[in-house]
Amino acid sequence: MIPNNGKLIITPAEGYTPHIGVLVSTLQRCRETTIALVKDLSIHQLDYLFDEQDNAIGALLMHLASLDVAFQEITFRGRNCMDVPELVAKWEVPMNLDAPARQQIRGNPIKYYLAEMEAVRADTLAQLKQHDDVWLWHEQSDGDTLINNYYYWYHVYEDEINHRGEINWRLSRIPAA
């Protein structure tokens, strides 16, 4: 994580081009806030489902990691992660957050989820160091939509903030074990 040294100021992270550095600072601040919220959760809290359509906090955390993987493939490698069998095997279930996620993403301690999130984020950060701001603004077609690399990575923290709100809501309502 990027230390804030008692400051809550978004500035370009060192070692990156200016705009990528701001993106990295934003991604990392978002992640730090998520980790602070979940770092002490029990397996009961991570696995709790309110109903048969619900997604547990553990599944949401794996979903956050899966977004890094998906956008690494699109923006760094120019391919869909669902076209890579080894990535499908590991990340399709958390990416989709459906019945298989409710059944399969269970029973893990928080350290498991945090390690998964950290591993994929470390790869994201290493890859972002290899690119410049021109790459960040590169536009491509995603079906009928024009999208740039910045938007993909913006969506990573946008989605994380949304799911963190969902996690907060859940934590205020999960009954004690």
Where are these predicted regions, by residue range?
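Short, mixed-charge, low-aromatic patches
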Residues: 16-21, 73-83, 119-125
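Acidic/histidine-rich alpha-helical segments that form the ligand environment
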Residues: 93-136, 152-156
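Short, charged, low-complexity loops and linkers
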Residues: 10-24, 102-105, 112
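Hydrophobic alpha-helical core bundles mediating ligand binding, dimerization, or RNAP-core interactions
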Residues: 27, 31-34, 38, 117, ...
